[in-house]
Amino acid sequence: MDMISLKSPREIECMRRAGRLTAQARALAGSMVRPGVTTHEMGTAVRRFIESHGAKPSFLGYGGFPGSACISVNDVVIHGIPGPLKLKEGDIVSVDVGAFLDGFHGDCAATFACGQVSDEAMHLIHVTEQSFWEGIKLARSGNRVYDISHAVQQYVEANGCSVVRDFVGHGVGAKLHEPPEVPNFGPAGHGPRLQPGMTIAVEPMVCAGDWRVKVLRDGWTTVSADGSLTAHYENTILITDGEPEVLTRVED
């Protein structure tokens, strides 16, 4: 089994730069969410932005993925392939972005409202994002990975939604996906112990209905099995001696 990598101060600084660029790309894509824009246009803008800063889109070609970002609309939870789909009023749009810079990856996601959306959709977006913040309250040295997982699940389910079981968060570093896995469900007190220098992507994937999902025939697009709305929120974080540090953030 691969070891969990603990990052050196130099590596952490590289990950801050990669994370900042990734967060900026997420914000750029989010700013484009409006009726009439295609997911292809959003993906192209992400690629141009990342490449203009001397970096590479982490997802492009990863496992054969054809896009530079995952743009997932409504019942698509994750891995939506950018294409001709035009956004319309009332859609909710998840943007998942990765950037590879100076030998390290950043990985982050958020779900955006397209114009006026339903109360159910706004509730789902809020619950998904807030569950991330609830989870990382437990992302402290000495705690265990599943302490985060349990906190995410508890918050989501207390608010009438469900967490996807088939896909999970993960370590991030020189590779886009590293150990450990970081589920959004499970019993507290289990999993690897968190240590300073660990860098992990915590990414609640949440359904308004049942948690079960299915992958479409393209091999990527993953939708809620019951057709319910879905949302996704993710940041790459650093475990420290104190509070966790969010690496995928746009500097103030």
Predicted regions and their residues:
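Active-site neighborhoods and metal-handling regions in enzymes and metal-associated proteins
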Residues: 1-252
